Amino acid sequence: MAFYISDRTHIYNAVVNTMKNAGFDLLERGDNFNLIWTGYTTIDDILPLNKYQKINHFPNSTNLGRKDLMWNNIFRMKLKFPKHFSVAPHTWVLPGQYEEFEEARKLKHMQDKMFIVKPAASSCGRGIRVVQGSQKLSNKEDSIVSIYVDRPLLINDKKFDMRVYVL
């Protein structure tokens, strides 16, 4: 069995090592693979595959991978099921909600808050920054801004995130 990593994605050592340990060979190129590890996919990426070939993303998975689209989905669920989706801090999607964000941070209880700004379509922690309440933000970049959680859940005194890779 063999797998191929397309040039549309970052190469994760955890993925390569797991696949090799499972008996897969890494191909440089070609069509004779069982699995292609790639970036976001469309239906056009999936249609040409043979029945023995699999792909690591399903169409429209950008709704889970892009931070702005993910927040829109979470926000819709917060409206529908407020009790179950109260764990996410309030977030604004920029540039569309830039004015709303600027108005919110002028409120007295928001002036001492810090905010975390993340590019909408970045990964691996690239471009993330923490800003003070009065620091000016660009209204031109696709990003999300959330109230910074200053006392998050920690494991061994460290912040963490959970990622799941299913093979």
Residue ranges and their predicted role:
Residues 50-52, 58, 62-167:
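Active-site nucleotide/adenylate-binding loops and adjacent lid/helix of ATP-dependent enzymes
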Residues 1-80:
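ATP-binding N-terminal substructure of ATP-dependent carboxylate-amine bond-forming enzymes
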